[in-house]
């Protein structure tokens, strides 16, 4: 993984593209901290949306993540959910900048394409707004190595009784990615 250094406002910021899935993303986070001494990580990207009526056109800030993957259990004690410790800092920043967002539970799974209607219904009933493949594992590694993790998403596809491509692919998704990169840069300058 290539790691890039940017100096802005007298601060050094490192960037890298995290791989998909908690094991790969978590291993890279662990190695980046060991190699660079970085103590704070901002992670952002797309997610599947379980509650489009709540999440439409808003940044999603996970407050807890359902641990439907095996990776996180190697780093922190077993529990259904892991607290996303940086969520308050992200929410406070977005609120101060008047950037629309919603905060709530998330679902991390490592079973790609297995967001079945029954699983979706269960997670929605527990208050999950989104689903993705890294957050719980990354938080577990961050907790284990003593790093601070700040996470936020933008809605990609929409999962429910049927699948909707939503904002996946194309110019709209690229624009969202660039917008979130700018938010991450500004957030990094303040933490």
Regions from the PLM with identified roles:
Residues 136-172:
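Zn-dependent metallopeptidase/amidohydrolase metal-coordination segment
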Residues 80-126:
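Active-site rim beta-loop-alpha module in soluble metabolic enzymes
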Residues 1-89:
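Metabolite-binding pocket within alpha/beta catalytic cores that recognizes anionic/polar moieties
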Residues 68-70, 114-116, 158-163:
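Short acidic/His/Gly/Ser-rich catalytic and metal-binding motifs that mark active-site loops
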Residues 159-191:
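His/Asp/Glu-rich mid-to-C-terminal helical/loop segments that flank catalytic regions of hydrolases
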Residues 112-140, 146-148:
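C-terminal accessory segment of soluble enzyme catalytic cores
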Residues 89-97, 141, 183-191:
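Generic non-transmembrane alpha-helical segments
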């Amino acid at each position: 993984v290539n790691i890039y250094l940017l100096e802005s406002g007298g601060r050094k910021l490192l960037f890298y593209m995290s791989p998909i899935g908690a094991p790969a993303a978590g291993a890279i986070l662990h190695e980046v901290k060991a190699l660079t001494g970085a103590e704070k990580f901002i992670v952002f990207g797309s997610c599947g949306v379980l509650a489009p009526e709540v999440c439409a056109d808003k940044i999603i800030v996970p407050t807890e993540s359902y641990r439907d993957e095996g990776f996180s259990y190697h780093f922190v004690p077993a529990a259904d959910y892991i607290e996303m410790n940086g969520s308050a800092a992200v929410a406070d920043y977005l609120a101060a900048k008047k950037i629309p967002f919603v905060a709530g539970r998330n679902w991390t799974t490592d079973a790609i394409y297995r967001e079945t209607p029954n699983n979706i219904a269960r997670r929605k009933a527990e208050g999950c707004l989104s689903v993705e493949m890294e957050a719980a594992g990354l938080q577990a590694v961050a907790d284990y190595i003593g790093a601070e993790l700040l996470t936020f998403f933008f809605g990609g596809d929409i999962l429910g009784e049927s699948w909707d491509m939503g904002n996946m692919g194309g110019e709209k998704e690229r624009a969202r990615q660039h917008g979130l990169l700018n938010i991450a840069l500004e957030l990094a300058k303040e933490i």
